[in-house]
From Swiss-Prot:
Span of the annotated motif 'KMSKS' region: 235-239
List of residues binding ATP: 238
Origin species: Campylobacter fetus subsp. fetus (strain 82-40)
Motif mapping: 'HIGH' region: 6-16
Family membership: Belongs to the class-I aminoacyl-tRNA synthetase family. Glutamate--tRNA ligase type 1 subfamily.
Protein name: Glutamate--tRNA ligase 1
UniProt keyword terms in alphabetical order: Aminoacyl-tRNA synthetase, ATP-binding, Cytoplasm, Ligase, Nucleotide-binding, Protein biosynthesis
Main location: cytoplasm
GO biological process: glutamyl-tRNA aminoacylation
Amino acid sequence: MYRFAPSPTGDMHIGNLRAAIFNYICSLQDNSGFILRIEDTDNARNIDGKDKEIFDILTKFNIKWDTLYYQSKNLKFHQEFAAKLLAEKKAFLCFCDETTLESKKEAAKTAGKPYRYDGTCENLSDDDVLSNPRPAAVRLKIKNEPQSFYDAIKGEVKFEPQNIDSFVLLRADKTPTYNFACAIDDMLEGVTFVIRGEDHVSNTPKQNLIREALGYTGKIGYAHLPIILNKEGKKMSKRENSSSVKWLLNRGYMPEAIANYLILLGNKTPCEIFTLEESLQWFSIKNISKSPAKFDEEKLAQINREHIKKASDERLKELGLSKPHLARFYTQECSLISEIKDKIDQIYSKKDISDEWKQNANLIKDAVLNSNIPNNFDELKNEIIQITNLKGKSLFMPFRLLLTGSEHGPELKELYALIKDDIKEIIAK
């Protein structure tokens, strides 16, 4: 069982979408099932409507989930399991306030050492616990031994004892921390494999320790995806437009092309242009590079252009391109759905022609409107020349403006073959 577990706290990042796609592909390959879990326990950061936005984006990418969970619905179980660990002395109550903890963190930072909880409350007597009026967090007791797990991309990953302290499971307000909620939910939902970002590597041993303390014997495999870098070779920030899936879609990239690019990124693939469905035949998480991959929007644009060429008429119409034959034609100079739509809309809109060309444009317009519109462009051109006596730039510039609304563009001869049936409608505007 695979899962994708986003938080409704902002726009979906391309790194998150990449993880969703990989989990989904693997779930289809072994027919094990795919869970969508909305991790909404951080009330302060949750944004209304972002869960629906997640559903909408996944649907656009044709990613279908078998079961939907909201993490907040499991709060009762998180608290019950924390109580179980306390009862079994595998966890303890911590009364340290935030001010004290922050002061210790600053001291560690000043000393150039990583902060590690010092166990202040771990060995309090029952009387000390019962007599303490302050609110308490719940921390897991940690054995002083190394932790390791096998990562399908990185291989064996090991953490020394000093790298994992007695971390918090439940905060003083009785809400679960990310690691506790995630570990419990994966256990309860029968998750067997998790593909997620490299920033979660240090969370994995903690989640394994939680389930181990609860006596859970089910095995969960992991693969941590390397980070995606921007064109400067730095970690892609959420503040960068191209890191947002919503922004890429609105800009005019097809879901098919974005999925293609994210599967291709840092991967060994038998070909460059493919669909998510086609990748099921050969995708393997083990082929993903351990090294960070650089996001190249120019490459994405090239892939987008190829998917526009391959798309059916029906699909292009779904994307707002009412003239599919023209859409494919304009891939010779455009890569985005939005750019192509602008080009086509310009052809079928009223043209604003400058005074320099207006007189000649009117002569050409009259000639075309009175023509029988031959199949051959050269025949129409010669017909216009005979009627107007216009030649060279005096003919072609106003004619181009009448057809496209632009001084530059494709060969009129090529364009004519695609729009001749509508040419009187176009010219008359």
